[in-house]
Amino acid sequence: MEEGGGSGVGGMQGAASNLLDAGAQAFYPAVGAPFPFQQLPHQLYCPQPPPPPYQVMPVPPPPPPVGLPVPPLPATMAPQPGYCVPAAATVVDGPASRAVVLSLVPPHAPEDEIARAMAPFGAVRAVDASAVASEGVATVYFFDLRSAEHAVTGVREQHIRQQCRLGQLYAAAAAAAASSPTWPPPAWDWPHDDNRGLVLGQAVWAHFAAASTVPDDGASRGSLVVLNSLPAMSVFELREIFQAYGDVKDVRESALRPSNKFVEFFDTRDADRALHELNGKELFGRRLVVEYTRPSLPGPRRRGHVSHQPLAPTPPRLQAAWRPAPAPSQSAQPSSSGSGKAREGVVLLRRSSGKGSSGSQSKGGGNAGHERKSKGGKSAAAACSTAASASSSTATAPSKQSQKGGGGGGGRGGSWRGQKSGWEARFLFKEPEAAAAAAGDAAASETHEPASCKDTRTTVMIRNIPNKYSQKLLLNMLDNHCILSNQQIEASCEDEAQPFSSYDFLYLPIDFNNKCNVGYGFVNLTSPEAAVRLYKAFHKQPWEVFNSRKICQVTYARVQGLDALKEHFKNSKFPCDSDEYLPVVFSPPRDGKLLTEPVPLVGRSPAPSSASGASSPPKSCAASVDPLAQELMTAPSSSGDGASSASSSNAHADEDDVHGETGGDRGDDAGLDLELQRLGYTD
């Protein structure tokens, strides 16, 4: 043991033995450390239980496959006689009219091609294709209202048919792709004409034009009015008479005048034929007076149509594109060629129509040709309608201005240039009354206000007379007007003689200071018809003398009749030195051929001396004007028609005087000769 122990550890003799001794003690260093090692207390280890395993949701099984059925091929259906239009095509979005608006029109489609596409529905009157290139919109006008209705229905039906064709073609293509590589030809199930309602092979859409863009005159609506039928004649009897000329849409009786009856045709050509055949025809002992109805007056009734406007309104450029065809004239109106040149307005007015105008207007004659009775057995009421439509704005414009001016005394007098008229509406000529009185018929259309056409007033007031105009020039103007009017009456009247134009009173108020008129004058005609003829010839016409820019205005005077005028000027004296400044009467009446000398109606008082007038300041112009003349005005003198007119006469006298005269008789004859030479009536 000792050998083994000594030799193994100390003398390294037992090198082959294990160097580690399992029985050796733990080694601790002999040197004391500053922080002696402390044995840690015994720790207990408590392991946590393992978490429960996660529950994995099972994946739902995929849904069973659903097979989409292949759409069956459309079955071929035989055409059925009871075929009806689809419900969508029967919807009408506006009031039916003869104007049809087409949209989605190919931009390169010409007018003739559009007319050719619409011709299967009925006769086409006109086509407006001005907006096709920019908006694809065209307006087609038909003669027959039923043709327009068929066109709207047919075009919409064709449009819906094309949409259904697309669906059928898609279904056929899907079925062909699943079965065979080639497409079978589709079988259409609607009996139809493939080209009906297509424009250049393209489907379009149609709707009726807006009511505000459709012409409202009788010629465009096929509407006639019978003015003097027997009140006992029923609408059924009248329908049978007019039914011989075409299909009648409606016959109704005027609520205000039982003798006036309205007849509306489906076709405007039938209405025109009935007008020419029945106007002036004897029926039950009475001559019929047939004419086109006039346009409706603007108002709440007209504006009430707004709720019926189509969903797709007419483009703005189409609203002014309508150009109604001129209605055939009721009778030829030859221009009068009497003794030399009828010089109405020789030194008065420049007619608005040119020298080359024909028909109802002759040179210088103006509208006077409308008053005469038409030839060929036709009633004068037809010419009355033409005259009323030709100058429909002559009385309405002053009426609107008078409403703005606040009645009868709102305007300033004098030249009336650029100012609003202020006379009362009761002194204005009413156009329906004027036309009916000129034609000798008391009946009027229901579209106008129910006013009596038997106006008995004969005294008129001529306004806006150039201040250099004298009584001699005014007499010459009236004489030529009477000559021309009477020549037309003699040339046209065959059955019923109308009263000739003549006058028996004339007064041109003068400013006694500057010897110039104050801008207005008074004339009493011998008949209401003559007053209407003077109004129609001179109203709203420019003057042609002294380079004046004034526009003539003609109204009724406040004092009416020769007897009332004589009573008005009774016991009056004017402070003037010439009879030319006085109101004058003519006995017998003067008509241009019978040149009755004027007889002063009042006396003259001594005029103030010129020396005293030159040294003293000028008096007020209102004091130098006859106050009785101001009372003849249609409005009180406070309105400016009297004194204000006189106060402005000085300025207008200088403006209208191109001859350098200051008034009086000195420039009258010379001015008349110069004007006649300038107009070509003298050498």
Swiss-Prot record:
Residues 328-340, 379-403, 605-624, 637-651 have a biased composition (Low complexity). Disruption phenotype: Plants produce threefold the number of leaves, and leaf size and plant height are strongly reduced compared to wild-type. Shoot apical meristem (SAM) shows a higher rate of cell division and internode elongation is significantly reduced. Some inflorescence branches are converted into vegetative shoots. The keyword Transcription does not apply. PROSITE patterns: RRM. SUPFAM superfamilies: RNA-binding domain, RBD. Residues 294-417, 596-683 are annotated as: Disordered. GO terms for cellular component: nuclear speck. The keyword RNA-binding applies. Plastochron is defined as the time interval between leaf initiation events. This is Protein terminal ear1 homolog. It comes from Oryza sativa subsp. japonica (Rice). The lineage of its organism: Eukaryota, Viridiplantae, Streptophyta, Embryophyta, Tracheophyta.
